[in-house]
Amino acid sequence: MEGRTAFLPSRDGLRFSNAWPPGPAVSVRTPLGRVGIGNAARGLCGGMVFAALDYWRTGQTPPPARPGPDDPLFRFIVRRLIDSWHVPWGVLRYYRWMRRPDQDLLRQRTVAAMWPQVKHSIDTGRPAPLGVVTVASANPLLIGHNHQVLCYGYQTEGSQVRLAVYDPNSGPDDAVLISFDPVQSGDPEFTHNLNIGWPVRAFFLTRYSPAQPPGAPTR
């Protein structure tokens, strides 16, 4: 791989996928009203991305088993989910991007602005948390249908770019990719094998601040 960090999903990702039984929704206040983003049944992708990155940064091995609702790791993942949304402004960012036309999202925001930032992060050894916009809607209740992944490497071939990502929905899988062509004429498209039921419309770099995860054996 042309550019990569030391993170590898099969080794450093959480050992379980983003599938949870129904649990209490965590409702947060935003300028758009209250938005529930912590219902475990709807997924905890952002919390899993941040938690995996926290374990990696501290040199700890992620726990091997899926935590129950009273487990400190589960509570930590939920807390990191809220952190990953950067309430309220992060929620508004998803909403603004959901409402924009594909041409603007792809060329001006993702390809021209975000891809160079992601590349720089990888080139300096820092995995890049990404907010993935999948929804085209003005309905704020659909914000939670967007997704979050962790980019840990990239490969270019001609004008084609392939991002290697840790997708919590896929578990510790090293073969998950998002691909695009930044110089494609017309409206460029993203191809991907993320474990989601929607197209990828755009992505942006998510601001990450480390946190201390629940104790685990040191490598």
Report each predicted region and the residues it spans.
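Aromatic-residue hotspot detector
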Residues: 1, 7-16, 21-30, 193-219
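Cysteine-nucleophile protease catalytic domains, especially the papain-like/related folds used
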Residues: 3-112
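Structured loops at beta-to-helix junctions and adjacent beta-edge loops in soluble globular domains
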Residues: 19, 48, 133, 166-168
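Short loop/turn segments at secondary-structure transitions that flank enzyme active sites
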Residues: 22, 51-56, 136, 155-157, ...
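Active-site-adjacent substructure of cysteine-protease-like catalytic cores
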Residues: 107-165
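Cys-His-centered catalytic/binding microenvironment captured across papain-like cysteine peptidases
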Residues: 142-146, 155-219
